Amino acid sequence: MTRILGIDPGSQRTGIGIIDVDESGRSRHVFHAPLVLLGEGDFAQRLKRLLHGLGELIETYQPQEVAIEKVFMGKSADSALKLGHARGAAICAVVLRDLPVHEYAATEIKLALVGKGGADKVQVQHMVGIMLNLKGKLQADAADALAVAITHAHVRATAQRLGVNTQQAWSRKR
């Protein structure tokens, strides 16, 4: 059994999703939640909260692998920079604990879950719910984090079948 932590980074809310994957490649939901950073003071204090909060979750749930969504250029350059800082704080929390980090673009995640790189958030949330047998509507940030974890589980299973590392498997899938 392998435990995978998925992270959907954000400067106001960071999605956290944790799954267990068995030897056959089946995924089981363990935990999901948004790590809310608003109200934590200035931006630097929010990054500190992200670093420490994510570190606590890693210590509690003990994942073996971590997958994180790559930065995309959104509304403005300022937003993209803040997202990059949040992503950096999240990656630091992971590598400080000597865990491997695997990165996936939003289009790669959508392709892995829905079959279309241009799928919308509702389609991704729906597929996450089906794949993990979750009832009710998932909160967007947490659903995205679970989607990142599921994507990594799929890439990981493909890599094992091909006898290559995950980076090589993903480049062959596309």
Curated annotation (Swiss-Prot):
Enzyme class: hydrolase
Function noted in UniProt: The RuvA-RuvB-RuvC complex processes Holliday junction (HJ) DNA during genetic recombination and DNA repair. Endonuclease that resolves HJ intermediates. Cleaves cruciform DNA by making single-stranded nicks across the HJ at symmetrical positions within the homologous arms, yielding a 5'-phosphate and a 3'-hydroxyl group; requires a central core of homology in the junction. The consensus cleavage sequence is 5'-(A/T)TT(C/G)-3'. Cleavage occurs on the 3'-side of the TT dinucleotide at the point of strand exchange.
Keywords: Cytoplasm, DNA damage, DNA recombination, DNA repair, DNA-binding, Endonuclease, Hydrolase, Magnesium, Metal-binding, Nuclease
Name of the coding gene: ruvC
Record-listed Mg(2+) 2 binding positions: E69
Cofactor (UniProt): Mg(2+)
Subcellular location, record wording: Cytoplasm
InterPro entries xrefs: RNaseH-like_sf, RNaseH_sf, X-over_junc_endoDNase_Mg_BS, X-over_junc_endoDNase_RuvC
Subunit structure: Homodimer which binds Holliday junction (HJ) DNA. The HJ becomes 2-fold symmetrical on binding to RuvC with unstacked arms; it has a different conformation from HJ DNA in complex with RuvA. In the full resolvosome a probable DNA-RuvA(4)-RuvB(12)-RuvC(2) complex forms which resolves the HJ.
Catalytic reaction list: Endonucleolytic cleavage at a junction such as a reciprocal single-stranded crossover between two homologous DNA duplexes (Holliday junction)
Similarity annotation: Belongs to the RuvC family.
Residues given in the record as Mg(2+) 1 binding sites: D8, D141
GO molecular function, one term: DNA binding
Identification of the protein by name: Crossover junction endodeoxyribonuclease RuvC
GO CC annotations, alphabetized: cytoplasm; Holliday junction resolvase complex
One of the Pfam families matching this protein, by short name: RuvC
Cofactor note: Binds 2 Mg(2+) ion per subunit.
